């Protein structure tokens, strides 16, 4: 379920009526909680937060979620370093940082999770492929241009979320791919 998408913030929920994960936390912790409550859930039902990249509209609430709510924050080492360098939340995330290697499969609450590179102007940007309850979910945010790995995952996914903004002036005048 999409809780928010766009330049003002990104956050997605994947799970069932008992437990799940968040993908990105680019809106306030209070707004996330409001969305969770509308689904009959609370932070106790969230097993972790998967981060796609280190821009503010994807990580706004990670400091609060890590420090106060004690949710594990999953990202590659490069993404965590970018978050710490750019937003100064290293102390808040000290006990909640969890690392994965891009391209290596790992598991969380019965979800098989893999990552792939996404073209974007951040420290590192990843998309997620999640196999859960016989379904394959693929999510990629802020896509600059597709790559072969993303296209292969699109062909095998049952559910696809691709988030991208198109602004011709930004493309013509900015460093975007």
Regions found by a protein language model. Name each.
Residues 23-26, 46-54, 74-77, 138-141, ...:
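Active-site neighborhood of phospho(di)ester-bond hydrolases with catalytic His/Asp-centered motifs
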Residues 30-75:
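Active-site metal-binding motif and surrounding structural segment of the metallo-beta-lactamase
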Residues 115, 122, 139-148:
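Active-site glycine-rich loop that binds ribose-phosphate moieties when present
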């Amino acid at each position: 379920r999409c809780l928010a998408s766009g330049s003002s913030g990104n956050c997605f929920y994947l799970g069932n009526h008992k437990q799940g994960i968040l993908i990105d936390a680019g809106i306030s912790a209070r707004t996330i909680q409001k969305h969770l409550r509308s689904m009959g859930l609370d932070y106790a039902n969230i097993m972790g937060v998967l981060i796609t990249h280190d821009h503010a509209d994807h990580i706004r609430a990670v400091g609060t979620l890590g420090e106060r709510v004690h949710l594990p924050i999953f990202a590659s080492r490069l993404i965590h370093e970018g978050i710490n360098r750019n937003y100064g939340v290293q102390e808040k995330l000290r006990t909640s940082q969890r690392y994965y290697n891009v391209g290596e499969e790992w598991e969380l609450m019965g979800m098989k999770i893999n990552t792939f590179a996404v073209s974007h102007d951040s420290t590192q940007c990843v998309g997620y492929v999640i196999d859960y309850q016989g379904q394959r979910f693929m999510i990629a945010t802020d896509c600059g241009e597709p790559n072969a790995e993303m296209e292969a995952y699109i062909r095998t996914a049952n559910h696809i979320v691709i988030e991208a903004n198109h602004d011709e002036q930004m493309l013509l005048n900015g460093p975007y791919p």
